[in-house]
């Protein structure tokens, strides 16, 4: 599973209220959530300016705060195929995997990244390449069980496929 795209770099401690502000939690429409993704972050125009396939790159503790699936859903339905960060809040990590949003921990890649760089991420082998800077980094590699969930598109789809086989 190879993912390639332009990055948008965010700071440390992006919490779920910055990813999807609480004022939008009265909807469960994923496309409506996506239209407000990152609205309360340091890049409030992200939802309007990013292109499908662009990648979010952030510092440590991405997704901290309230436990809500709305945050990874907003990111996924905005067309962001992966989030790369120095570290993730544990509940965000689990929610992201459950809805089929790949997340990758790679401190060195984040430290050296700049807005607009092109990343190529090999999830299967735990490799992040900054194509712009021609640098390659080792990232945390997913166990096969989590890769199977991601390949299926999330935990529900994975469970359905297991039950039907």
Swiss-Prot record:
InterPro entries: Aconitase/3IPM_dehydase_swvl (IPR015928), AconitaseA/IPMdHydase_ssu_swvl (IPR000573), IPMI_Swivel (IPR033940), LeuD (IPR050075), LeuD/DmdB_bac (IPR011824), LeuD_type2/HacB/DmdB (IPR011827)
Residue ranges of coiled coil: none
EC numbers, comma separated: 4.2.1.33
Subunit composition and interactions: Heterodimer of LeuC and LeuD.
Family in the record: Belongs to the LeuD family. LeuD type 2 subfamily.
Gene: leuD
GO biological process, one term: L-leucine biosynthetic process
NCBIfam families for this protein: leud (TIGR02084), LEUD_arch (TIGR02087)
Native organism: Hydrogenobaculum sp. (strain Y04AAS1)
Function: Catalyzes the isomerization between 2-isopropylmalate and 3-isopropylmalate, via the formation of 2-isopropylmaleate.
A single GO molecular function term of this UniProt record: 3-isopropylmalate dehydratase activity
Protein name per its UniProtKB record: 3-isopropylmalate dehydratase small subunit
Pathway(s) this gene product operates in, as recorded in its UniProt entry: Amino-acid biosynthesis; L-leucine biosynthesis; L-leucine from 3-methyl-2-oxobutanoate: step 2/4
């Amino acid at each position: 599973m190879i993912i390639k795209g332009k990055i948008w770099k965010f700071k440390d401690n992006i919490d779920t209220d910055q990813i999807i502000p609480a004022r939008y939690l009265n909807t469960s429409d994923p496309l409506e959530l996506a239209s407000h993704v990152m609205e309360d972050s340091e890049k409030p125009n992200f939802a309007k300016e990013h292109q499908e396939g662009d990648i979010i790159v952030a510092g440590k503790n991405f997704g901290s705060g309230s436990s809500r699936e709305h945050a990874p859903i907003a990111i996924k339905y905005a067309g962001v195929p992966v989030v790369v960060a120095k570290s993730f809040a544990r509940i965000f990590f689990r929610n992201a995997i459950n809805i089929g949003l790949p997340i990758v921990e790679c401190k060195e890649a984040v430290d050296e990244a700049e807005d607009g760089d092109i990343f190529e991420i090999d999830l299967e082998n735990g490799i992040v390449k900054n194509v712009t800077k021609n640098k390659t980094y080792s990232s945390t590699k997913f166990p096969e069980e989590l890769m199977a969930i991601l390949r299926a598109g999330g935990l529900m789809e994975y469970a359905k496929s297991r039950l039907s086989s």
